[in-house]
Structure formats: structure tokens, C-alpha cells
Swiss-Prot record:
Actins are highly conserved proteins that are involved in various types of cell motility and are ubiquitously expressed in all eukaryotic cells. It is found in: Cytoplasm, Cytoskeleton. One of its GO terms (molecular function) is hydrolase activity. GO terms for cellular component: cytoplasm; cytoskeleton. Its EC number is 3.6.4.-. It comes from Brugia malayi (Filarial nematode worm). This is Actin.
Amino acid sequence: MGDEEVAALVIDNGSGMCKAGFAGDDAPRAVFPSIVGRPRHQGVMVGMGQKDSYVGDEAQSKRGILTLKYPIEHGIVTNWDDMEKIWHHTFYNELRVAPEEHPVLLTEAPLNPKANREKMTQIMFETFNTPAMYVAIQAVLSLYASGRTTGIVLDTGDGVTHSVPIYEGYALPHAILRLDLAGRDLTDYLMKILTDRGYSFTTTAEREIVRDIKEKLCYVALDFEQEMATAASSSSLEKSYELPDGQVITIGNERFRCPEALFQPSFLGMESTGIHETTYNSIMKCDVDIRKDLYANTVLSGGTTMVPGIADRMQKEITALAPSTMKIKIIAPPERKYSVWIGGSILASLSTFQQMWISKQEYDESGPGIVHRKCF
């Protein structure tokens, strides 16, 4: 088949948002929540042509009558039937393409279970009949998007956080660290601390409201203790937020207590290290000769890194951990919310990449296991 004239599709399936579009574009065409919603009550909308499931924005807008489920948890697909619905929605409703006509580049979390990657491959070839596909590691794509081939990526999205050291384009698997603490946990934590203040947020629909509060009002304090003192002594840090029903709530130290959990997971009752220490530990697992390059190229990626103040705080924390003479540079590209997708768009449109695709023919000859041989 002539790959030249057919644009490849790039789909970055995140735990929170699905980003999809065409290789060669500079931004995804479609960005929608990775949600499948099902009616809570049977037959409440008789004659409305009610569907048995809704995907993405439509599920989000009808959330009041639906139970919302995220098929991707902690970066890994846990519900394949729902995942298939999301892919179907991506091809036919969002991009409006026939998947059997385009090669598809999918992304996956680092250290993804082998079976997951095989299942993705199988669904693409057997359910959607794609002519070719490839599975790339998310963090590596983020680094490509920043124009580098060496560096360490701290990728923190909605479901999972990874620190991935990459040297000359290859992820170093022995030094990848994973932290099951990301945006969704911060949302849950904000729900909890707002509930402690007497506001009630419990349902899956209300969780989405809290996510919005988090995205609009939270920030990372450079000095947590000092910020707490400021918040206690004045109302300068307080902000108000109007709920969908018109009620106005005031949020004070919760604004920075919520994302502080990234640096102090003990806030969530977790025994893990914070994102700064995880990044540092990852660098320390690498060969001593390349550490300098990693410290100087620490790239933030993923939606949770969009929280204001995170780069300065990372700079401060890593400087405190690293040798005193080390040059440390935290790179936070403005488009980092989509840098995985952008990296995929770059990769899939390279002429040198075209022989890397797994073709339908190779799949038919070798089965799903081919993915481990072709996608390192």
C-alpha cells in the first residue's frame, strides 16, 4: 500500500483524556474525556431514542443521568469493551475516518503489561481492520516533541505518573519509575478536603465539578509551610467558585494543599516518594556518565504538570537533592498537555519511521506477539 498519500492517525489514550488526530498536524483534532457513561435508571427518557452507552463529551454533558466509568485506570486499560467503544467513537464520530484506510499510531504507558499491548494490537487489526499500526511509549514521544533525544521525562497525567530517562531516543527500562499518583488522585483528595469543610461532593458527576475547581484554582506553593501560614493569617489566597446550581463556595488553603500531595504523597496516605524524589531516584538509577544530561534536560509532560508553580518547585526540590555543582534545568513546554500526541504526530510523519509500522500481513503471519518485536 502507498503510505505516502494516506495520513496516519495518532491516538493518545490517556486515563483522563483521549487525544486524536492526523500525523503531521501540530495539534490533535479531537480531545475528549476517556469516559463511557451508562444510564443509571432504565427508561427514564422513553422515546428519546436513548442509547445504552455514551462516550466522551456526550457522556460528560449527560452526566446527571449516567454512571461514568473510565476504562483506563493508572494508564492501563482495564475494560476492553469500553475501550473499544472509545476507539470506535474516535474513528467514526470524532475524526470521521475509516480505520481500515489509515495506519494507526497508539501510545502506551511505560512498563505496560505485555498482554495489554497485544490486546491493543489485536483489536486494531481484527476489530478495526487497520492496514498498519504501531505502539509507542508516551514519555518518549513527549521528549521528541520537545526537540530532544536525551533527557528525563516526568509525565504525570490523570491516572499515573512516570519518570522515564531517555538516552539517544531509547527509554532506559531499568531506571523507569512509576507512581500511581496523578490528577485523578488529586481530584479525589480535593473532594475529601472540601467535604471536610462541609461541602458535599460524592457522585461521579460531582467529581467532574471538583476536577474543574482543581484545574481553575489550584497551584503549587514554593514553600508549603510558609504558604500555610499566609493562608491562616489572611484571606489573600481565598478564591470563590460558582457551582452549576449557582451556589458559591470559597476555597483557601485547599488550593495548594491539593497539589502538594504530588510532593508529599503521605497526604493521601501513600508511602511513596514525591514526584521530585521519584525523578531524582530515576536519574540515580542511570549510568553516572549520563546523569548530567538528564539533570539539564528534565522535561515535564502531561495535564497534571499544567498546575501553576510546579516547575519552580521541581527546580527547588531537585536542586536540594542533586550535587551542589550540578546544572539543573526543568523544561515545561507550554503545549505539554498534548506533548505526547505532538511527539506521535512527529514520529508517524517521519520518512524513516515508515518501515517501522506493523503491517496487517505481518500480524496475520505472526499474531499479536509481533508487537514486542517491532515496538521495543
